[in-house]
Amino acid sequence: MSRLSGIEAINFYGGSAYLDVEELARHRQLDNSRFENLLMSQRSVPLPYEDPVSYGVNAAEPIVSAMSPRERDSIEMVITCTESGIDFGKSMSTYIHEMLGLSRRCRLFEVKNACFSGTAGLMMAASYALSSGAKALVVATDLARFTAADAGEALQSDWSFAEPSGGAGAIAMLVSQQPHVLRLDPGAYGLYSYEVMDTCRPVPDSEAGDADLSLLSYLDCCENAYRDYASRVAGVDYQGTFDYL
């Protein structure tokens, strides 16, 4: 049995419309220098007929269309990864699976977690591909949602800077034992998690949070996850081991 798994193919869909970040920040009466530091010039905007499902399908369709019927039938798992879910019970993977015309001999489910769900889905798919020899399709898809008042004033001033830097997009990854794009190292990982109230979205169109707390939590998790990684993987070096950083 192969001990290799990872990303066989990958595709991105960023929508068909965008806004100029500088113009948007000026309209919201924000300091443009903050967005210059982020090296941003444009942000995608979902059109009224677009949602996380349509974004996900557009990301995955070129990958699936390039596969032979036999290869498509080897996809035994479709995972959607999002924090923009459209249903409390039904997974978006069911819609994406149907629109892509994939075999019904397939597992369909969704992972919800801010920022981490795409990575979690990829790791889950890689483990499945490693154990079964089948392929898995991972679709990370999100639409940023911001509610703003008229006259350029954001309803939530603390989060008004997030609007110009948040957009919409989807990435589809075909995961298998033929990792032409990226090979994952099985068993090499670091764990560190805890609850922190840095962000909260209790209803679909409203969000609250603490950006400073979020940043500090990320740094804390990065440091301690690396320590756990180093305890599992011999000879690891932060500067030399991770070629893609």
Descriptions of predicted regions:
Residues 33-37, 42-50, 84-135, 141:
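Conserved catalytic cysteine-centered active-site region
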Residues 1-50, 156-228:
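Condensing-enzyme catalytic core mediating Claisen C-C bond formation in acyl metabolism
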Residues 2-4, 73-76, 103-106, 130-136, ...:
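Short coil/turn connectors at secondary-structure junctions
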Residues 130-172:
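Flexible, glycine-rich active-site loops centered on histidine and acidic residues
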Residues 32, 59-76, 223-243:
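Phosphate/pyrophosphate-binding loops at sites that engage ATP/ADP/AMP, CoA/4′-phosphopantetheine
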Residues 87-95, 123, 131, 143-154, ...:
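Active-site-adjacent elements of ketosynthase-type condensing enzymes
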Residues 76-84, 110, 245:
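Short glycine-rich or small-residue beta-strand-to-loop segments that form or flank ligand, phosphate
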